[in-house]
């Protein structure tokens, strides 16, 4: 898992695709100072590849890590992937919308929205998964979960 790079630091990461992830990233960015003050780091994970995540970070002046989930490896490992049904895929393709194109793979699977609070060992202590995660993963919820972790003391 991505947080194991720095085993002494808890982290908050958010996962998703398209418009949802862009809104979630902006919300996570707004919480980043509080998350850092709690001794953790904020990470966003998107299946988008190429320059898109980097450009989004630059254009919105975001101060957090944005990582690409190539081939949905992280999302699959957490069971956070849904397969796009043929009855939805076909009309989208007829309109010229190929949801797999920005991801760099040909299969039509999308990550489910999720926000996790992980401790310094990479163990999940709070999970907000699915459509409700948009309203559940508030700054207050995340900070409350971080305050319950046994880990580094909050930064002054």
Please give the residue ranges for each predicted region.
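Chalcogenol-based redox active-site neighborhoods
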Residues: 1-156
